[in-house]
Amino acid sequence: GSQRNGIDGAHILTPMPDLISSGAMTANNVQVPMYILARLNLAGQCISVGNEYKDLKVGVDASQFRTAIAAKRASGKPVNAAMTFPGGTHDMWIRYWLAAGGIDPTRDISTIVVPPPQMVANMKVGSMDTFCVCEPWNRQLINQGIGYTANTTGELWHNHPEKAFAMRADYVDANPNATQALIKAVMEAQMFCEDPANREEVARICAKRRWINAPFEDIVDRMRGDFDYGTGRVVENSPQQMRYWKDQASYPFQSHDLWFLTENIRWGYLPKDFDMKAWVGKVNREDLWRQAAKDLGVAASDIPASTSRGLETFFDGKVFDPENPMAYLDSLAIKTVRG
């Protein structure tokens, strides 16, 4: 934390607070208790592929991609899929997509970690065949003529949870008033970003060197909800655009944390006997979100009555029931579950 010249909180991939709190993704498996205080957005990520596969016009169906990469591997060439952090959201999206297309992400392709700003450069030199990342890197890939968008992640799971606002538990416990002020500030920012009239201004802010440090032109279209896939397919005001406040985007449903942990079990990052519900109960502080929302004057109708968003249906027909995560896990054909 800040007492040791570190940080107390962050904009973070949704499952990471659980993985850090449990020690699953920390050095020497040291547990660092954290709290999820809000969700920051829904959807808005993309899976891109290189121009090597341009003729395939790969989309949500990865079956043709499966055939192409199998042939490439058979010729002795490496095949790589890049994401931003093991067990994180981008890792989960690209693994889900690959597996749904019959590609085993642990056997049929190498999964590598690449920081978001380095994705395009690595694709350009042929270090990877596909990647999953946030914007503006997918759009930048198209603008530089290096690849195209296969799908937006909302096409895999409509209005899926993505980033979270999380803080160290010791800071929150010691500073309840400051924590509430921070949550309310985040909520107000989410409301501002949700308004279409503000999207261009937000894009200009994000383009600055101190933030994303990328051309405005690479950011603005998709922030407005307009998606040019780089294949001739163009969708304006996409239903899969990123949401910041609408559709209860800010609320940290515990059911969503359960899905991410179930997927981490699916891919062997967590053991099958990992007590998901216990950890979610420790890490998810929806109670603090509710308090901040009420203090901010958020309408009661905009404050979810349940900790669960209910059944979640994916593009391949799979259904996740937060009341029975193991049934969902058992239904998945491709997985790497450890004891």
Feature map (PLM): residue ranges:
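Short, glycine-/small- and polar/acidic-enriched structural segments
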Residues: 1-106, 110-112, 125-139, 146-159, ...
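A bilobed periplasmic-binding-protein/Venus flytrap-type ligand-binding module shared by bacterial periplasmic
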Residues: 44-57, 160-177, 192
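Short acidic active-site motifs
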Residues: 118-119, 137
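Short gly/pro-enriched beta-turn/loop segments at secondary-structure junctions
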Residues: 159-160, 201
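Secondary-structure end/capping motifs
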Residues: 174-285
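Conserved C-terminal helix/tail region of periplasmic/extracytoplasmic solute-binding proteins
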Residues: 258-339
